[in-house]
Amino acid sequence: MGHFTTGVTVVSYLRDGQAAGMTANAFMSVSLAPLLVMVSVRKQSLFTSTVGLGNLYGVNILCECQEDLSAHFGGRRSETLETPFFDDYDFPLLHGSLAHVIVRVVDIHPAGDHLLYIGEVTHVSHGTPCPPLVYFSGKYKQIQVHQPSVQWHSQQGW
């Protein structure tokens, strides 16, 4: 799966009334009506012992300059990194992220050693205009503008 490019997010949640987070790249849109998204979480994570049906979680879509936050919330904790949480929407989100999504859990499905958290979007906001942080083949990458060799015309369909 390392040859599939993904965006990088930090999923934020409340644990014992305090802001907490974990890095996740298994985040996706599920439905437009209703607006549903999903995140895949390892069963042994603190998230799964804290967040259940009806609870909220936040998805912070990281900018390419936020590798340090990805590493921090991915388990390589930095004692010197200040986590820039804010709660303008009564929920902890990360300053400097490309976008923020707040989600209410509507379903949880077991999938091997993970749980799939499906949630209805309750809030979306744009954050910092910046290129996204992406991950490919075990490394962070930067997106470059690509000039396609073939032009796609919407009238042609798929």
Where are these regions (language model features)?
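Basic, polyanion-binding surface patches
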Residues: 1-158
